[in-house]
Amino acid sequence: MHLPRRRRLQRNRIFFFLAVVSLLSVYQLQFSPSAIPALLTAHQHEDPVKVTSREPFRNKTSKTGNVTAAPKIRHCVYIDPEPTVPITASEDTTQRENVNESYPDEKPVYESKGEYPQDLFSVEERRQGWVVLHIFGMMYVFVALAIVCDEYFVPALGVITEKLQISEDVAGATFMAAGGSAPELFTSLIGVFISHSNVGIGTIVGSAVFNILFVIGTCALFSREILHLTWWPLFRDISFYIVDLLMLILFFLDSVIDWWESLLLLTAYATYVFTMKHNVSLEQWVKEELSKKLNAVQAASAEHMRKKSSVAVAEDGTKPADGKKLQPTTALQRGTSSASLHNSQMRSTIFQLMIHTLDPLAGAKFKDRVDILSNIAKVKADSLTGQGTKPEAEEEKQASQNTVQVTPASDSEPSKDKQKEDTPQDGQPPSDSDNSEDSSSDSEDDSDDDSTDDEENDEPLSLEWPETRKKQAIYLFLFPIVFPLWSTIPDVRNPDSKKFFVITFFGSIIWIAAFSYLMVWWAHQVGETIGISEEIMGLTILAAGTSIPDLITSVIVARKGLGDMAVSSSVGSNIFDITVGLPVPWFLYSVFNGFSPVAVSSNGLFCAIVLLFLMLLFVIISIALCKWKMNKILGVTMFALYFVFLIISVMLEDRIISCPVSV
């Protein structure tokens, strides 16, 4: 019975695909640049040419006549040169008057250089209220981008990593990061090749600040408990991020980007991927060096304490010494890549959140995370059994009071996350209350249906009719997005469609490009109506819209207790945006235009990048002042810094204030 139904579904998909292709062709023919606007622009450009060609001719004849005439008869020759100054100025004024008369609706401040189709509504009609449709369409495209990335693009990348047998760290830093940052990448491509503006730069810079400040602040505010951060993942990612930002600032000094500068940024990303490949050995080397120095310092301090205190006090004083001794080892046991958050198994898709879970901030189960990460460990256990056994034996000797058992795969995710829940935080041994809470939560999770929740993450996209009224309303709201995607792209989470992962990969790219084009186009129309530039739209609205899926996923992960994963993923996605999302369009533009440089001049973008660097420093200082804890104070501080950045960036772009660091 299922065979004819499947054939009908295949036929429907083929018919739908042909219908979409035909509609796109008709749309292209209808909205192609016609001859009438070309003639109008030609006549408009001919009029000022005629004026300028006649007036200099009159000036020349008057001057030649004055020279041939007798100076004794006409002394008014000295009066004629006086009107020559306003005559030359009148040429510019007549041109401006002709331009203003030909374009009465456009503002002189905002000039459009993009290649967009003609809108159904004029500027005056949009200012009368029809711009609401563009705003709604832009918000709707945000949801569409999130669905196509989470439901199709990221699972296809997961299949590619399985086929290529790439490790989890490298896959997370490359493919999964590309899946999370695909909208920013295509926005940058559209900004360089279609809109001819800096909307892509503004979107990436704004998205970077949004990920660092707003996402971290939201995770700190909505986390169930105070999250303790470790310094190794944050130090590793922020070090690369600072170097990349400094390179970008240096390249922006001359307001152009050469092809070799784009290659340097791509090389920086390749260095980051290489570091993630050897993350385990690098972490162990840093761990050994720090443990040697800390052991020497702690031995000296222990001897000093024994000399000054009595035997009873010395017994009490050994506990903080041992606690200090545990601090570097436990802090260094959890360094992982930033891209585990972009894993298709860890990401809760927008469609699942809106249909199956109406409260996206609801608590997720700790047991689910352990099961998912244990599956990753099983794949990596065979290849990593011989690595890291000696350093971890030393760790067990140093952390003798710790009850955590470390598996030989030191870089595997389950050992990292189990230590996160069981190991002491900030050098303090785990309390009995924490252990009781963990055991109680595990027992509660064991009683639930964990298998069904694990299957939901890998469950293919379903078009079944929901039961409740609210879910049915959301289903109807998302149906115009979900049905075309379901009809044209195979879902690789379905075992029968897993072999078509290449079609899913390229089909997702086409849909992401189409949705990104609609987003940039409608953002341009909204900005033209309101009177703001595309750079400001990218810094504010587009940056927040493209980062909302990562925001929701980061908050869910933070509420699970994975503060390191939430913070490190935010920084890791920014590294991909700056070192891939920006230089790839620039390099392609240089290649297609004879290796000519790309102009990136803007009123406030350079200063916005400098502000991004300063905000990153403020984040590091704030986390250090909060003693590496994600508490409410840190969340409020991050929100305040984000709104300060937005206000200063908009004022710089509108030239309300001048950039003090511009050259």
From Swiss-Prot:
Glycans are attached at residues 59, 66, 100. Its main location: membrane. InterPro entries: K/Na/Ca-exchanger, NaCa_Exmemb, NCX_ion-bd_dom_sf. It is found in: Cell membrane. Retinal rods. Localizes to the inner segment of rod photoreceptors. One of its GO terms (biological process) is long-term synaptic depression. The modification Phosphoserine is found at residue 337. The keyword Phosphoprotein applies. It catalyses: Ca(2+)(out) + K(+)(out) + 4 Na(+)(in) = Ca(2+)(in) + K(+)(in) + 4 Na(+)(out). It is a multi-pass membrane protein. Residues 32-128, 195-200, 254-259, 493-499, 557-574, 626-632 are extracellular. Residues 308-343, 384-465 are annotated as: Disordered. The uncleaved signal sequence is required for efficient membrane targeting and proper membrane integration and topology. One of its GO terms (molecular function) is calcium channel activity. Keywords: Antiport, Calcium, Calcium transport, Cell membrane, Glycoprotein, Ion transport, Membrane, Phosphoprotein, Potassium, Potassium transport, Repeat, Sensory transduction, Signal, Sodium, Sodium transport, Symport, Transmembrane, Transmembrane helix, Transport, Vision. The chain crosses the membrane at residues 129-149, 174-194, 201-221, 229-253, 260-276, 472-492, 500-520, 536-556, 575-595, 605-625, 633-653. GO terms for cellular component: neuronal cell body; plasma membrane. Residues 316-325, 413-423 have a biased composition (Basic and acidic residues). Residues 434-461 have a biased composition (Acidic residues). Residues 150-173, 222-228, 277-471, 521-535, 596-604, 654-663 are cytoplasmic. Belongs to the Ca(2+):cation antiporter (CaCA) (TC 2.A.19) family. SLC24A subfamily. Calcium, potassium:sodium antiporter that transports 1 Ca(2+) and 1 K(+) in exchange for 4 Na(+). Critical component of the visual transduction cascade, controlling the calcium concentration of outer segments during light and darkness. Light causes a rapid lowering of cytosolic free calcium in the outer segment of both retinal rod and cone photoreceptors and the light-induced lowering of calcium is caused by extrusion via this protein which plays a key role in the process of light adaptation. This is Sodium/potassium/calcium exchanger 1. It comes from Gallus gallus (Chicken).
